[in-house]
């Protein structure tokens, strides 16, 4: 409760969403792992298969965490965006990678005042996109930098947990520690006033 009320940032109208795997053990030790039996699941990320959980994050353009959700490793990245509690402070543009592509999800969020902006897959038809949105999509790497700092500086991922509660406390402590960083990854941008649309 303290983390979500006192340590979270405020939405600026430009937000980024992403998920990152939280591995609880090496793949070769999955069958031997007893601590997370029945809770952790096998999932797949851009880096391959893993056993553990996912940390879903929404940040603003200043690198401040707006909300987070911990799920099992096999959860679809789009599922948290269907939860009203996960998006209750979010408005404006929400930028995500291709894993968030969903026409139905886009329409649901649009009704709630959130414009979900994603890239397109290779075999999809080109879609019209404003130059501003195209530029902001290229700056989406800021949330990947946040994930990197959470893992490498705040140490939210390691394989030495002796209980599930210890695992959760470690993640929450890491997120709280990050919120007090004096300098966070952020983006600089200028709004381009144009009515032109670009094929993406």
List each model region and its residues:
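Short alpha-helical elements
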Residues: 1-200
């Amino acid at each position: 409760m303290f983390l979500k009320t006192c340590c979270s940032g405020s939405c600026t109208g430009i937000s980024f969403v992403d998920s990152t795997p939280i591995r609880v053990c090496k793949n070769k030790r999955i069958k031997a792992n007893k601590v997370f039996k029945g809770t952790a699941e096998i999932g797949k990320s851009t880096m391959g298969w893993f056993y553990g959980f996912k940390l879903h994050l929404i940040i603003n353009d200043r690198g401040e965490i707006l909300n987070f959700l911990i799920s099992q490793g096999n959860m679809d990245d789009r599922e948290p965006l269907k939860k009203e509690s996960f998006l209750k402070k979010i408005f404006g543009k929400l930028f995500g990678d291709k894993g968030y592509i969903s026409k139905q999800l886009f329409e649901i969020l649009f009704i709630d005042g959130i414009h979900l902006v994603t890239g397109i897959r290779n075999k999809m038809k080109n879609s019209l996109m404003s130059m501003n949105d195209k530029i902001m999509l290229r700056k989406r790497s800021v949330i990947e930098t946040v994930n990197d700092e959470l893992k490498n500086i705040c140490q939210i991922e390691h394989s030495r947990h002796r209980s599930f509660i210890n695992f959760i406390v470690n993640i929450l402590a890491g997120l709280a520690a990050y919120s007090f960083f004096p300098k966070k990854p952020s983006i600089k941008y200028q709004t381009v006033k144009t009515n032109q649309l670009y094929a993406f």
